[in-house]
């Protein structure tokens, strides 16, 4: 074989290897509407862009049902989701697997691959479970440290008003699950339903006592809770599943960009609860833009130049 033929063959091989990246469609990156959704969506977006992937920014697209509907219909290609939501997606809330980080991940990964051709990538070692927080002055005065204490307080006729999203109020595995486990029931005048699912809004409502609110829906990785003078109520009965955040990508898109899993693995593996709380606080308390917070973190860790 001549040198020219070898050279021509090498160029052809190089073109073939490069072709999928060049020919692939832009990746539609989405996320939920809340603070952490903005953070994780921007992290995914920026990691992909740093590797030359063209993207369409659909970060903070909407609530869980909206974003889930978008990826199953192909309107989105990748977004961050939480393992515990598998219980809700597959109507399987009673399986104890959802309360174990590894078992829950393996289960949702298997079900989504089989039924929806969606691939779950490496999750973060964090639990962004739903919680209820109360104003610290109310907690201290009434000895409230757990949801069991809250149940007792409400039975005694304690003043209570909760700011929460409609999703938290209505979903069987959210507020209704807490009410059932801890034997209390909130009336409509004890609830302030806020649009969307952004806990930065619900937490501020409690901190500022908006419309008489003294408690709020929050997440386990929310940063501003203590900073705003609120206290998280523990869940001693373990009502909530483990909600570990992970990138979820359409199988067809992962085949176009097989390196995606490798790019995102170390990034999500670094996002433990303390790290997420700090990053979320930068957005919700300090008022920094989620795009900037994501960029600064990725640069600091050396994943993006």
Stretch-by-stretch model annotation:
Residues 1-10:
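Bacterial N-terminal signal peptides that target proteins for export
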Residues 9-18:
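Bacterial N-terminal signal peptides
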Residues 35, 57-69, 166, 187-204:
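Short helix-initiation/N-cap motifs at beta->coil->alpha
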Residues 35-54, 176, 180-182:
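Short, polar/charged alpha-helical segment
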Residues 47, 65-76, 92, 181, ...:
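Short helices/loops that flank or line small-molecule/ion binding pockets
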Residues 83-176, 180-184, 188, 194-197, ...:
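Contiguous mixed-secondary-structure segments that line small-molecule binding/active-site clefts
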